[in-house]
């Protein structure tokens, strides 16, 4: 059967509540896919929970704006965390391409090591893969791993995004 609609939730791994909400939306709703933040502290534990949902597509949510890097990079703050998304407001912030390539490759490889197969697709936290300075890196990785990229060009439209946020606890996910 060909998938006609993919409904994807970003940020799997950001927190337990986010992960439980995503799993509940898949189990009880129309969510078909999620993308995983591989540099988050408890990602192994959270990915273990996905084994109960074999029809949930799992991609990698490439990240350079939250948490600690998996590799040695220069685009970190004084605490060793990635610089915030505000660093990239002008959409042209300079990141060393080889460092970016190694970091994102490490995130993909960590996913493969934990899950045992390649991800379904790539996208990125705060859409940083769409920055001109980062586009070649994500395209190179997509080609290397033979993966689709969600939204490979930046939309230039006048619209207001709508954000939905639900607070889930471990009790709520079992409802």
List each language-model region with its residue ranges.
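Hydrophobic, aromatic-enriched interface-forming segments
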Residues: 119-157
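Active-site beta->alpha N-cap acidic-glycine motif
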Residues: 1-67
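Alpha-helical structural signal in soluble globular domains
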Residues: 25-28, 49-53, 110, 114, ...
């Amino acid at each position: 059967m060909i998938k006609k609609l993919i409904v994807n939730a970003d940020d799997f791994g950001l927190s337990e509540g986010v992960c439980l909400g995503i799993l509940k939306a898949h189990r009880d709703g129309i969510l078909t896919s999620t993308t995983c933040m591989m540099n988050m502290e408890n990602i192994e534990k959270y990915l273990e929970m996905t084994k109960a949902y074999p029809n949930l597509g799992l991609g990698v949510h490439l990240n350079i704006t939250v948490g600690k890097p998996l590799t040695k990079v220069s685009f970190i703050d004084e605490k060793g965390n990635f610089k915030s998304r505000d660093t990239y407001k002008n959409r042209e912030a300079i990141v060393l391409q080889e460092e970016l390539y190694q970091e994102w490759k490490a995130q993909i490889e960590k996913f493969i090591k934990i899950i045992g197969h390649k991800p379904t697709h790539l996208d990125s936290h705060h859409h940083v893969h769409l920055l001109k300075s980062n586009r070649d890196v994500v395209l190179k990785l997509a080609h290397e791993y033979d993966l689709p990229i969600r939204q490979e060009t930046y939309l230039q439209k006048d619209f207001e995004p709508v954000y939905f946020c639900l607070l889930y606890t471990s009790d709520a996910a079992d409802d």
